[in-house]
């Protein structure tokens, strides 16, 4: 029986090269695709909705793929699985939360597991004035809480989106997607098996969000890395590759 293709979706402000630490540990012969998100790495920009970003990736996806999304890429992967289930056989979600921003207790649907709205708004405003500095600051947050912080920081900085090849407006739209998206109500529609991978020290998307997600998705399990931040596939690529291979093998 042929193994499915593996599609790796990177996070905001970075490029497909962020997967270069992981791919050497994946099984030989596995077909791996690493498309760029809209507006990243010279790809065309799309509308400011998660659905538009997901649909832009459809030509890159074979049927019945295993889709592995990290951070914003994880939200895109969830949307693909819900709206295009023939494209997504199984999911791997790394450092992914259904809702990036906290919602207050008096909101219709409170959510305590995220960044404060003021922090994210600050990122959006700062990016509009100084994209390069904001990207570097975002990368620094992703490495926090990791025992191999320097290794992670170096890998992330090497994979930073080249602003000369990117569309700043599209990158700004990606930040707004993170700020505005609340995917909790749609989780029951994801019927595919899901492997969650999360760092206990994640400073962007707290572990509690992944723990909540694991209880709400119909078919999910969570692998926790105690000494990791937001990018466990960079600090523990071999361990993450083993988990991904298990998903690919079904």
From Swiss-Prot:
Q: Where does substrate bind?
A: 12, 71-72, 138-142, 230
Which pathway does this chain act in? Cofactor biosynthesis; biotin biosynthesis
Gene that this polypeptide is encoded by: bioH
What's the Enzyme Commission number for this chain? 3.1.1.85
Similarity comment text for this entry: Belongs to the AB hydrolase superfamily. Carboxylesterase BioH family.
Cross-referenced SUPFAM superfamilies: alpha/beta-Hydrolases
> Which reaction is this enzyme known to catalyze?
6-carboxyhexanoyl-[ACP] methyl ester + H2O = 6-carboxyhexanoyl-[ACP] + methanol + H(+)
Q: What is its main location?
A: cytoplasm
Q: One GO MF term, please?
A: pimelyl-[acyl-carrier protein] methyl ester esterase activity
Quaternary context:
Monomer.
Please name the GO terms of the biological process aspect recorded for this protein, alphabetically.
Answer: biotin biosynthetic process
The entry's protein name is Pimeloyl-[acyl-carrier protein] methyl ester esterase
Q: Does the entry annotate any disulfide bonds, and if so which pairs? A: none
Catalytic center residues: 71, 202, 230
Which residues, by range, are in coiled-coil regions? none
Function, in words:
The physiological role of BioH is to remove the methyl group introduced by BioC when the pimeloyl moiety is complete. It allows to synthesize pimeloyl-ACP via the fatty acid synthetic pathway through the hydrolysis of the ester bonds of pimeloyl-ACP esters.
* Keyword Acetylation listed: no
A Pfam family recorded for this sequence = Abhydrolase_1
Where in the cell does this protein reside? Cytoplasm
The keyword Transport appears for this protein = no
Q: Name one GO cellular component term.
A: membrane
Tell me the keywords, alphabetical order: Biotin biosynthesis, Cytoplasm, Hydrolase, Serine esterase
